[in-house]
Amino acid sequence: MKRIQTFLLTLLLLTSCLSRVSTPEPTPTTAPVYTGTPTPFQPPTETVTPVVAQEPTATPLPRPARALILSIDGFRPDAIELTPMRNLGALMDEGAYSLVAQTIFPSSTLPSHSSMLTGLCPDKHGVNWNDYIPNKGYASGIDIFDLAHTAGLRTVMVVGKEKLRQVTEPESTDVFEFINDRDLVIAARVVELIPQGFDLMLVHFPTPDWMGHKYGWLSPEQYSVLFRADEALQIILNALEGAGMRDDTLIIITADHGGHNTTHGSRRLEDMTIPWIIAGPGVKHMVLSTDINTTDTAATVAWALGLPIQPDWDGRPVLEAFGLPDEPHIQPRCP
């Protein structure tokens, strides 16, 4: 079913491109230029056509050349105030953010990442398991990687948990790498991939979740690995800068869920509340007042890259981050 949806999406994109090619652009008219010379008297039998002043056009927003989503597994937003995360803080100062965004229920890694990238609530994408179970297949619906790959964009995923293979089909990623290691090791691999180019990349840091399960959320041990995650972020930002890609890359940093004690998955605020930070071309500096859900991540990336937002998506683009009026939610929030 999902392959049929992707095929129809390809036909839609091709039809849109052909219609744009076949329609000739109108020839612009040039208003007469005032030279400062007095206009001679015109006989009353001649008609003078008034020149209508044109309304000033709004400056178009700069569009990013690419988008990078960094998901920090198990990252509670209240940890930001308790952990020295200088690089994350710099992005917050540069861009827009919310520290009260919400994930979906169940607040677990695989269902949440599926909602993050498909823009759908769990009852639509169907991922209700949280382990790597290949025979269960993939999340249903057209996800952001399907859209990007169908449009001819280069798509990359570098993740620290193998179960994230089940978010999207293999043919929707040009590069998929599972690295069962620390965040700094994952970042080092991302640095090697950046010069090869990408249009859409997901990077997943697993270590904060591991430490939360072992030592507890907001434990000293988790603070320590969040500090390392910030160092890993710096490595990626430096690589983008070195490749001349930093200024035209849209960056979203978020999480799949939070946690309490040594667990998560419930509807408790500690489990459901996540950070949502965005920086890059066109993004204004502000604390976002918009009600943000993890499903909005896919819609925001699609909007920024000029990809078609799917009508059945529950998420919508966070336009407030770009200084624009937010669109109302057509779909209700996830139950």
PLM features per residue range, with description:
Residues C17-P62, H329-P335:
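Ser/Thr-rich, Proline-interspersed low-complexity disordered segments
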Residues F7-S16:
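Bacterial N-terminal signal peptides
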Residues P62-R76, A90-M92, M116, A148, ...:
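Beta-strand elements within well-structured catalytic alpha/beta cores of enzymes
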Residues K163-T173, P195-E231, I235:
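Active-site His/acidic residue clusters
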Residues H113, L117, R267-P308, L319, ...:
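Substrate-binding rim/cap in mid-to-C-terminal beta-strand-loop elements of soluble/periplasmic
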Residues L307-P335:
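Polar, surface-exposed loop/tail segments
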Residues R63-P64, G74-Q196, W303, R316-A321:
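Active-site-proximal alpha/beta segments of enzymes that process anionic O-linked groups
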Residues L68-I69, N87, V225-R268, V301:
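Metal-dependent active-site segment of extracytoplasmic phospho-/sulfohydrolases and closely related
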